[in-house]
Amino acid sequence: MYHLGVPSTRALCVVMSTSDTALREWVGETLFEPCAMTCRVARSFLRVGHLELFGRRARDFGSAEARLELEQLLRHVLAREYPECLDPQDDSLRPALMRMLRPMGERMAQLMAQWWRVGFCQGNFQSDNCHLGGRTLDFGPFGFLERYNPRYCSWSGGAEHFSFRLQPKAALQNLASAIRAMDCLLDSEGREEGQQVLRDFPALLAEAFAEVRMEKLGLCFWDSDAARLCDELLQLMEASAADWTLLWRRLADVAQDWDELMEGGRLLEPLQGSFYLPLSPELEAAWSRWLLRWLTRLQGEGDCEEVAQQMRRVNPKYVPRNWMLMEAYEAAEAGNFQVAQRLQQIFASPYEEHPEDEARYFRLAPVEMRTRPGVFVMS
């Protein structure tokens, strides 16, 4: 996620035991697998759930000790995640908390837009998996979109409320929970500011999403026409069973060579291999119409080569799809770490071409992986 440009905690190392095993239950089989620990690093690992716990204690118990613990936690949040909200001349907690509310909402909105940009579905985005500093925290049942389905959820227990399209709604609920947990430490002005941030959150989301959508489409500014273009594209992608990563990346090829493609009647050619189902004549016609509208808009955006390069800087060519990761850990289990090492190199520069890896990794998900438990969806 870090190399994709998405705010995230980072992995330092993985340590595997050579003796201890744990019972893991998979679909249709029960296995003992080696135990391992992942060491992650970040400015903090503070979650909304932490704040909820101490906020509830302070609210329900009402003791000086419970209130002090909540204050200590929030001072730590400020010091580690929002030091710009501290006043060196004033150690008072209340005004610092009030100054922190809006940046917290802004970071949450930015994180949701960045997840959308790269097609990331967290799968279980409740308060225990929501970082107070606006970073990607928990990588449990996550999944990157293959076939675009806005209702996709990578966790079998997530239903639609943790789906790709509803992650911003979950973020709003988590933000509301965080603000509610601070309530007993805010005065009336601070409580009103918290409610105003919640009221403004849809606008913060709209601004963050407009920015990433504009960049993904290669546009210089966002307006109602650009919004319609993007909405129509998403509808086409869903109707056509388009691969999220492949389609966005290959649009840059259309932008770069549009004049040659149009002259040869080959406008759809760069998008071939991006769909999980054959395109009907009606969908082919719809794609052609959309591409013409989009290219007409792009002609006023600058040099074709520059537009294409800008699009490639925000539309990754490679993301850690679960079937790729499974291939790596199955090889590692057999003592071959070359696959994992190569993927690590690719994911360190996911916007680069890596032509030697295209056939293997810049492709639709293998047929046998498209519905496989533990790959397509996780428990």
What are the residue ranges of the model-derived segments?
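Regulatory N- and C-terminal appendages and interdomain linkers associated
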Residues: 156, 160-379
